[in-house]
């Protein structure tokens, strides 16, 4: 099954119509050999400095620059985002191919890459 991940539900609906994914499921569309799902823009963000080290919890000139190795991402703490991410995570695990249908440009690419990374995409 091919999985398309769009950046927003309206784009996912348009893609689903084109590829024949006309069956609406919980958090995605399916049909024609495709599953089409969406993010709500940023589902993930970089972890806060304190998530890396207690020494970085409070700002201090002595702790600058803060450059964690490696940078880590986390889900944004919003229930609807967590729910949609769990749907995406399951779809990615079952997919043969994942197609990045995020918005064109650096930000759209980043949104999709972080979601795929957090979901442990192997495609």
Q: Over which residues does each language-model region extend?
A:
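Intrinsically disordered, low-complexity regulatory segments
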Residues: 1-123
């Amino acid at each position: 099954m091919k999985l398309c991940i769009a950046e927003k539900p309206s784009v996912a609906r348009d893609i689903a119509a084109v590829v024949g994914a006309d069956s609406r499921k919980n958090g995605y569309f399916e049909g024609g050999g495709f599953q089409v799902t969406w993010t709500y823009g940023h589902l993930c963000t970089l972890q806060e400095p304190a998530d890396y080290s207690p020494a970085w919890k409070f700002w201090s000139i002595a702790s600058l620059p803060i450059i964690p190795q490696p940078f880590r991402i986390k889900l944004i703490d919003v229930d609807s985002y967590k729910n949609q991410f769990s749907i995406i995570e399951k779809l990615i695990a079952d997919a043969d191919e994942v197609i990045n249908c995020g918005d064109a440009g650096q930000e759209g690419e980043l949104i999709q890459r972080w979601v795929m990374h957090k979901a442990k995409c192997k495609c």
